[in-house]
């Protein structure tokens, strides 16, 4: 991909950034290099998952995750540097997820980055994890601003307009649970294993997506907000009402839940596509609908969104599967973008459990995306 030079300093020399990620249950380190002509190369990309540690509990246990991040991070950094053939002294900056996420996990990447930056005298770039997902397709292909972004994962479901690095306008957000939460919790109820989303998708392959009637969240309601709590509850009630459920019952309910989530995402995205066209009538065609985050790896969701995009004259853009879930390559990319603009942070940069991607969300009253736990990132 190419990053357009943004300053004389950015054009003068190549930049190499180490990115670190530990916001949930993947520990990751990656190194990206930006050449003078704007092209970007992934020099190293390491990810260590924690599925085996969390599987007995059916979900991510924050304390276990934080401990695993702390134990793994130094080794992954060493592996990434060795893979790239570099030393810390060769880097131009250290980027790390600073939030949002599980605070104990976030601190593992951020504190490691601070130590490296201080010891080597390198700039620190504190990265919003959500911006990493927002820009992740740009790791592998040119993607011009503005574009419509559907950010969909286990913790977030948002529709935003991406107008530039650090410039985002939210059109809608979940009012309760994220789409990935509905996937994961339904999978847990049916005993499909962890992680739940991919397990449910595999189970759905042999299921009948028309067998069970599930509600379409916010059907007919204006706006671009989402709601998945009711769908999650309805799926559980259907499961609890089955007498000695069979493997086929599991497959059918998995297929129905997957189809309902895909319909909900595509119907709200349809509204956002129209709003994007109204806002940018002169944008170059075809315009881009970007889907990013862990749920972007779901093939049924991608297919539904591809249909919506094509009907509206957009092209669907998604990162490669390996960069849909949490990774450090996207963190390093944001680090490159910000470093090229001279946007660096002090060693007092905080770890944040919540950090809205769009500044207006944190100031709105009531907060955009408010739910049972308050303003969501």
UniProtKB/Swiss-Prot annotation:
Protein's cellular compartments? Cytoplasm
Q: What class of enzyme is it?
A: transferase
The record's SUPFAM superfamilies line, in alphabetical order, gives: Actin-like ATPase domain
On whether Cell membrane is a keyword of this UniProt record, the answer is no
For substrate, which residues are the binding ones? 151-155, 184, 197, 298
* Pfam families for this protein: TsaD
Q: How is the cofactor bound?
A: Binds 1 Fe(2+) ion per subunit.
GO CC aspect terms: cytoplasm
Instruction: Give the E.C. number(s).
Output: 2.3.1.234
Q: Where is this region: Disordered?
A: 358-377
Requisite cofactors: Fe(2+)
Give binding positions for Fe cation. Answer: 129, 133, 326
Q: Does the keyword Metal-binding feature in the UniProt annotation? A: yes
Catalysed reaction(s)? L-threonylcarbamoyladenylate + adenosine(37) in tRNA = N(6)-L-threonylcarbamoyladenosine(37) in tRNA + AMP + H(+)
Q: Which GO MF terms does the UniProt record name?
A: iron ion binding; N(6)-L-threonylcarbamoyladenine synthase activity
GO biological process terms held by the UniProt record: tRNA threonylcarbamoyladenosine modification
Q: Which UniProt keywords apply?
A: Acyltransferase, Cytoplasm, Iron, Metal-binding, Transferase, tRNA processing
Gene3D superfamilies assigned: 3.30.420.40
Recorded family membership: Belongs to the KAE1 / TsaD family.
UniProt function note:
Required for the formation of a threonylcarbamoyl group on adenosine at position 37 (t(6)A37) in tRNAs that read codons beginning with adenine. Is involved in the transfer of the threonylcarbamoyl moiety of threonylcarbamoyl-AMP (TC-AMP) to the N6 group of A37, together with TsaE and TsaB. TsaD likely plays a direct catalytic role in this reaction.
Protein name per Swiss-Prot or TrEMBL? tRNA N6-adenosine threonylcarbamoyltransferase
What species is given as this protein's source?
Maricaulis maris (strain MCS10)
